[in-house]
């Protein structure tokens, strides 16, 4: 049986396209290295993903007694959440719909073999 722990952040107020740029950088890294990389990134998505990775590490440590030094980011997925529909006034009495996109961020950490 493989030891894995998971953490999910739902309806994060960031577009999936922007969040995937950061997620691709930490996929497959050791958990400690991933947190360090995210800590020094100035992107908004990095802060959100760092919190989810730290939560997954804490889940592995507390629920399954895993050694934090042996954990790595096995999978990280950014799926599209519900969009907030907003209205922007345009010329000649018209209006345009704006989509404020949200993301579901899922992180699975497990023991590196």
From Swiss-Prot:
A molecular function (GO) held by this record is:
rRNA binding
GO biological process terms on file: translation
Write out the entry's keywords from A to Z. Answer: Ribonucleoprotein, Ribosomal protein, RNA-binding, rRNA-binding
GO CC annotations, alphabetized:
cytosolic large ribosomal subunit
Task: Fetch the PROSITE patterns from UniProt.
Answer: RIBOSOMAL_L22
| Gene3D superfamilies the record matches | Ribosomal protein L22/L17
Report the record's disulfide bonds.
none
Work out whether the entry's keyword set contains Mitochondrion: no
Record flagged with keyword Ribosomal protein: yes
Supply the InterPro entries for this chain.
Answer: Ribosomal_uL22, Ribosomal_uL22_bac/chlpt-type, Ribosomal_uL22_bac/org-type, Ribosomal_uL22_CS, Ribosomal_uL22_sf
User: Subunit comment for this entry?
Assistant: Part of the 50S ribosomal subunit.
Q: Which family does it belong to?
A: Belongs to the universal ribosomal protein uL22 family.
- State the protein's purpose: This protein binds specifically to 23S rRNA; its binding is stimulated by other ribosomal proteins, e.g. L4, L17, and L20. It is important during the early stages of 50S assembly. It makes multiple contacts with different domains of the 23S rRNA in the assembled 50S subunit and ribosome.
Q: What is this protein called?
A: Large ribosomal subunit protein uL22
